[in-house]
Amino acid sequence: MKIRASVRKICEKCRLIRRQGRIIVICSNPRHKQRQG
């Protein structure tokens, strides 16, 4: 899980989701997991 100021989709399988007021990227590739902090 990378914590970044700006999250973006890295590949076409990445999904942007809002959870508990945070924007999270989930993907089938675990390296693409990101959270906005």
UniProtKB/Swiss-Prot annotation:
One of its GO terms (biological process) is translation. It comes from the Eukaryota. Coiled coil: none annotated. GO terms for molecular function: structural constituent of ribosome. The keyword Metal-binding does not apply. GO terms for cellular component: chloroplast; ribonucleoprotein complex; ribosome. Its main location: plastid. It is found in: Plastid, Chloroplast. Keywords: Chloroplast, Plastid, Ribonucleoprotein, Ribosomal protein. NCBIfam families: rpmJ_bact. Belongs to the bacterial ribosomal protein bL36 family. HAMAP family: Ribosomal_bL36. This is Large ribosomal subunit protein bL36c. The gene is rpl36.
